[in-house]
């Protein structure tokens, strides 16, 4: 992906500098250009580098394709209710770059940002200094890998791989695999390993889950029709706390389906509570597995309750669906 060659404005003034050339930075660039505001986008590596280098082979979107709505470039492919795989996501981003031709300068890392003495902001970069009237930070919340400190206590002979570096089951050494965490990445990687026949031990956390489909529609579609995605942080009951919430686990793999850890357990996956300690090759877990599973199920059921209430309140014609208890 390339937006062409742009010269870095060393020592100069730019009305707006956008930091980060991923989907957020590209979207900001589109909106600034539409408003006629001069700007540059500084990307430390290359456009969509994280997508190209820090996703596993079987990666696919969790939300339906129709929800891909980069400004000025909504998804127009043949499968709006499907879930793009990695190569398709990259193709979508490449198409966006070609369509909007953003003023991205690649290979320039911002190392310091401070308020300027004459107003605005001074940026120090690997290509020199620049002054900006305004700065948009679009570097993303997941670009720095987070590894539990307990990992340092594991023996050197045990291979450790961060989710951003995981590619496929075949790349891992033979033997059982312990997956730490049940956010979206942890659950999807655990499923990837499980489907490949690997022995998987999964340390759970408090991440909630959500059903893939309910009462005739993808749950994401229901939430969109209910106005959930138009709710701002300011209007949300949790306020700023909502920014720190863990995303619900579900998958778009093979057409999309629930991720139910209890079902995985019936198929041989070993589930545990939160990882507490490491003593040599022995791992100690909290006694909170049942609470973690029950909590995830409770959130999934509460979302269904909300959908039921909205259907009833608005007289929507939707097929009934059994609410079966957990496995």
Regions found by a protein language model. Give the residues of each.
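Flavin (primarily FAD) cofactor-binding/catalytic cores of flavoenzymes
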Residues: 2-21, 27-50, 84-327
């Amino acid at each position: 992906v390339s937006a062409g060659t742009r010269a870095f404005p060393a020592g100069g003034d730019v009305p707006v500098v956008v930091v980060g050339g991923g989907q957020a930075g590209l979207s900001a660039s589109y909106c600034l250009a539409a408003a006629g505001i001069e700007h540059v986008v500084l990307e430390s590596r290359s456009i969509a580098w994280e997508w190209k280098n820090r996703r596993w082979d079987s990666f696919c979107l969790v939300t339906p394709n129709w929800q891909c709505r980069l400004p000025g470039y909504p998804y127009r492919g043949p499968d709006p209710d499907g879930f793009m795989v990695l190569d398709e996501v990259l193709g979508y981003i490449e198409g966006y770059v070609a369509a909007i031709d953003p003023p991205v300068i690649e290979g320039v890392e911002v190392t310091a940002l401070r308020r300027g003495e004459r107003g605005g902001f001074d940026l120090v970069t690997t290509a020199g200094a620049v002054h900006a009237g305004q700065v948009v930070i679009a570097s993303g919340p997941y670009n720095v890998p987070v590894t539990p400190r307990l990992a340092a206590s594991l023996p050197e002979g045990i291979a450790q791989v961060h989710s951003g570096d995981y590619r496929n089951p075949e790349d891992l050494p033979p033997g059982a695999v312990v997956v730490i965490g049940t956010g979206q990445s942890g659950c999807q990687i655990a499923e990837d390993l499980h489907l490949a026949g690997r022995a998987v031990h999964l340390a759970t956390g408090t991440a909630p889950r959500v059903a893939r489909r309910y009462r005739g529609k993808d749950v994401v579609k229901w939430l969109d029709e209910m106005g959930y995605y138009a709710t701002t942080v300011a209007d949300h009951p949790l306020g700023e706390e909502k920014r720190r919430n863990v995303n619900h686990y579900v998958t778009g793999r093979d057409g999309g389906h629930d991720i139910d850890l209890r079902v995985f357990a019936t198929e041989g996956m070993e589930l545990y509570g939160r990882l507490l300690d490491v003593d040599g090759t022995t791992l100690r877990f909290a006694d909170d597995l049942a609470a973690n599973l029950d909590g995830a199920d409770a959130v999934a059921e509460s979302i269904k309750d909300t959908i039921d209430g909205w259907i009833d309140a608005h007289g929507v014609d939707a097929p009934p669906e059994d609410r079966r208890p957990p496995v």
